[in-house]
Amino acid sequence: MEETCSESPKESNIISFIWHKLLKRVPPPIMICLFFLLLQIFVISVVSQCPPGLTPLFSNSNFNQPLTCTPQDACSCYSSSGSSRFGTICQYASTYNNYICCYSTNTQCGSNSSPQVSASGQVVTCSTNTQCASGYTCNNGACCPNTNSNTCSSNGNNGCLAGQTMVNGQCYNSVNIGSACQSTQQCLGGSQCQNNICQCYSGYVNVNQQCVISNGLNCQLGTVSYNSQCITLASPGQNCQTSSQCIDNSVCMNQMCTCNNNYRLVYGYCVPITSSICQQTQTLVNNQCVLLSIVGETCIANQQCVGGAMCNSGTCQCTNGATAMYGYCISSSSSSCNSNQVSINGMCYNTVQVGGSCSFSQQCLNNAVCTNNICVSTFCSVSCSTNQVCISNQCYNYVSIGSQCVGSQQCLSNSQCISSICQCPQGTQQSNGVCTGNNNNNNQCQPNQVLINNQCYNTVSIGFQCQFPQQCLGNSQCMNSMCQCPTGSTNVNGYCQGGSNGQCNSNQVLINNQCYNTVSIGFQCQFAQQCLGNSQCLNSICQCPSGSSNVNGYCQGGSNGQCNSNQVYYNNQCYNTVPIGSQCQITQQCLGNSQCMNSFCQCPSGTTNVNNFCTTSSSSSNLCSAGQTVQLDSSNQPINCLVSTCPNNSFCQYSSSGQRYVCCRSTSGKKK
């Protein structure tokens, strides 16, 4: 590097001007004192350009001008003049509008070497080399620069600690992808600092904290790409991480594949909800109730076939583009999504950053939730005032109809943020400053609204303001005008999880080991068990079944005994059937041979719950027909062939005595 030999025009001219004026007026003894005082002021002004505890490095030939340097060059502060030293740092000095070399005067590392210093100018002490930054070794309790190289010190960090990097003369911690940052130099794994977050460049994805080219993952059939990994598909009722895993018309809710609206879970399959009078394991074909059939079994109509199969030549078969696996038809497209996409209901959708446009919450990254077609972060570490709401970790004022907005959470009076303006949604109109429905609109609120007291109100995510419990999403409750998770549960990806011990609140019901709010007639629902007053969850609304009407919050009617397929007739009323563990009023409601005890469907004494059926160990012998034996799993329980594949030389058949599908084997050893 070239040394700067010219004097600093700023300090040098000032000193010269003052010196010549004083020579004419001040006696020599006083002049000598003033000279040293001015020299001290000059040195202090230069030293102040270095961090605390450090001193500017001057060349032997020019004491007025510190050595300049290049921040990216670790050797730029080392020269053959003898004034340069190992272990200096390159610091920007505003006085010179340039970078200058700064060093520690500590002599623990020798006369021509400065020990490693922190950003505050403190000498880094050590007992082993591992405590020193790259290019330094521990010597006499201090981290000293390596001087045994012909290319100066090999230290690339210019004096920062291990795990730090130098940015404009300051030491900053190196951070992983997804962490907060101030400069790209901090970001590891080939990422960049964008919006104060270390992120991969466009066209790259994060794989094990390394940015790699986003060319998609080639996952095998039966698996799906998620977070740059191939994960196994999951059937209804099984645990899941994302809805892209879930098959057979199910989505991932509360970490379990749950049947979509208008479908019900029947022994591992999502079966459409119909108004027929058949049992839940049957469907109506030509006015006759016939058993449902899995892949490979006989059929007479498509509606018999479950698991995505179709009736072809009298047998339930998978259509073109699908393969029979685990008793389901698996689409070959399930593994064709790129790593920056997710599979939702058999379609590939791009993942979306917080603030981007979305259709499903599964698209949103960083555990955000798709609210009003925008990925909204559920994470808020800031505390907002009472007239503000937190959106994507920032505080925004609540605003009235007609005002500019960032998200619908800001909008008051049931308005929504449409085109960045709080407006009344379609189907509502402004009346006295509030968005109200048009003559009830036949109960047709928007998909992100709920009907309460003949008015449409926006649904609300956890952590946002509410007026009624029915507005709160994710099983949260409206407490202190805020949707919050009830005691004993926590917010996990926008859903309140907990209550697995069956101890739900009095206004909740246990479904799939989770607590869900009970819902009155006319309000939104996910499961029939939520609906009160003998109503049913139809089109995501608790409604009275055909033939009955709402009388004081209770569905009355149906005296002809024609209840729906998921109901039972008792005392001139239709009651919803409920699985084991759910709330009940009468035993006739309880499925799987359970009984209504203490308002819950429970297995009677001497029996246990096996695949949602109360059974005894001795009762499994008569599940198959004469001359056949039931096949048991590793826990000595009958195999549910709608969930697991039957072993060799066995077959899947419906057991009328057990009211379920089991694997049976002929005692003669021949397959059926």
From Swiss-Prot:
This is Prion-like-(Q/N-rich) domain-bearing protein 25. It holds the Pfam family EB. The lineage of its organism: Eukaryota, Metazoa, Ecdysozoa, Nematoda, Chromadorea. It is found in: Membrane. It comes from Caenorhabditis elegans. GO terms for cellular component: membrane. InterPro entries: Cys_repeat_1, EB_dom. Keywords: Membrane, Transmembrane, Transmembrane helix. PANTHER family: EB DOMAIN-CONTAINING PROTEIN-RELATED (PTHR37157:SF2), PRION-LIKE-(Q/N-RICH) DOMAIN-BEARING PROTEIN 25 (PTHR37157). The keyword Nucleotide-binding does not apply. It is a single-pass membrane protein. The chain crosses the membrane at residues 26-46. The keyword Phosphoprotein does not apply.
